[in-house]
Amino acid sequence: MKKIILALTTFLLAISLTACSSAKPEDTIDSFFNSAKKFDFEGMNKVMENNDEKYKDILKELDTKDPNAQYVLDYLKQNASKITYTIKDSEVKGDKATIKVECKFIDSTPLLQEIVAEAFTKMIGMSFSGQDLTDEKTTEMLVSIMKEKQKSVKETYVTKNVEFECSKKDNKWIISSVNDAVADVLLSNLVTAGQEFSNS
């Protein structure tokens, strides 16, 4: 499960996209989000520049036979499908453009807080009873808690701004860079939530 989250995060933080036939930079943004909302990395790869190897690594991680990892992956896919976005500003200067996008998406932080709190209590009990906590047992326990907590934790949304830097090459607009907020948008705020837990 950790490998999947890490692979997805690495992929999203290294995005460098190119549109196949975009007349406007906004079209490139639409192409990106249309594939991203489907968690369609093959579709995203078609508009990427020099990311073939990263894409292959992603597919390898996503091709999992572990039911627990698949459950988490399905959760992220379902959340991604609910992303909404609005292009708030488009500033074009010659062959350069800055596109500011407001994204609304599911915030997994409340669910993660509940999972961590219960897991911590259970792991202390297991430790005192002498039970061996393998990675497999830990993952199984976390997903079991996740399934239970999803029944009671209310689905909440958060809004973040993503800024895309675009450039025009050969009459096509490409995304040359994007800020790190895009990873939170596509991974239900897991990146920020994970950092907060690590620092607490």
Where are these regions (language model features)?
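Positively charged n-region of N-terminal signal peptides that target proteins for export
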Residues: 1-4, 8-11
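Short beta-strand edge/turn micro-motifs at domain boundaries
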Residues: 119-137, 152-198
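Residue-level signal for tight coil/turn positions that link beta-strands
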Residues: 92-96, 170
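Short, cysteine-centered beta-strand-loop-beta hairpins and adjacent loop/turn segments enriched
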Residues: 104-122
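Intrinsically disordered, low-complexity acidic Ser/Thr-rich regulatory segments
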Residues: 73-77, 138-157
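Core segments of small alpha/beta cavity-forming domains
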Residues: 21-67, 71-87
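A short hydrophobic beta-strand element
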Residues: 95-105
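C-terminal motif of bacterial Sec signal peptides marking the signal peptidase cleavage site
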Residues: 16-19
